[in-house]
Design a protein with these regions (language model features):
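Rhodanese-like catalytic fold shared by cysteine-dependent sulfurtransferases
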Residues: 2-111, 128, 134-174, 182-255
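A conserved helix-loop-strand patch within extracytoplasmic ligand-binding domains
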Residues: 111-115, 123
């Protein structure tokens, strides 16, 4: 039985410097139809964010052509599944590729990227505030040992939590993580703008960690919620047990 690749990738770059967004949208949608790839691509002036699936041949053809359209080189995260967990063709233009609803100076740069192999050392330090930037229903399916749950319903709630609970003078070292890295890539410069200087973020997100770090060495407890029909993943990116649906937003998947 042929397996399907689930491929996620994103990049913060000025897409309007490449091609007008409506044209990019149409070209990518046509490419999805042509190659048979399914999933969602979000476009904004600040960049792109994609979650796609297809056979190995379909994905190879799509990524080769899409890289030319977007004038980039992809660094995708890839996992496998026996069925297509994504079934629609959807290319959207939005104000943001991940919705924070706050001004962010991306030029401040991301935090220090920590490879999965070094992540345990960072979050085991008592001086480190370990921040799960995901939502409450994601946290309850699984998180890193010692991580703090901001109890947010959506990503745009996180700035209010920071304003009420963190102080740059007291919380000098913050290590943050999310599913695949995109939320941290945006939130790290936001926190730098607030005066937090020592920011660390998990390179490749939880997905790369549970793919890379052996279970016996892992500080990850539970399963990782994902935004497709698989629902959750465990170590080695294996589909987890169907979660309690009360742990997620019943109306929509907020990121």
């Amino acid at each position: 039985m042929e397996q399907f690749q689930i491929v996620n990738f994103y990049e913060f770059k000025q897409l309007v410097d490449v091609t007008p967004l409506p044209e990019v949208k149409e070209r990518l949608k046509e490419l999805m139809i042509e190659t048979g790839v399914r999933g969602t691509i979000i476009l904004a002036e600040e960049g792109y964010n994609a979650s796609l699936c297809g056979t190995s041949d379909e994905m190879s053809a799509f990524l080769l052509a899409a890289a030319k359209i977007l004038d980039t080189e992809f660094d995708p995260k890839v996992s496998l599944h026996n069925e297509r967990p994504l079934r629609k063709i959807d290319v959207k233009i939005k104000p943001e590729i991940v919705t924070l609803k706050q001004p962010v100076d991306i030029s401040l740069g991301a935090g220090t990227h920590v490879k999965p192999e070094q992540w345990n050392e960072i979050i085991s330090d008592e001086e480190t505030f370990v921040l799960d930037t995901r939502n409450d229903y994601e946290f309850k399916n699984g998180t890193f040992r010692g991580a703090v749950n901001p109890e947010t319903e959506k990503f745009s709630d996180l700035p209010a939590y920071i304003a009420e609970n963190l102080d740059p003078a007291k919380h000098k070292r913050v290590a943050m993580f999310c599913t695949g890295g995109i939320r941290c890539e945006k939130f790290a410069p936001y926190m730098k703008g607030l005066g937090f200087d020592e920011i660390y973020q998990l390179e490749g997100g939880i997905l790369r960690y549970i793919e890379t770090v052996p279970k016996e060495d892992s500080l990850w407890d539970g399963e990782c919620f994902v935004f497709d029909e698989r629902r959750t993943l465990t170590h080695d990116l294996v589909q987890g047990i169907e979660p309690d649906h009360s742990l997620r937003n019943p109306k929509r998947y907020n990121r």
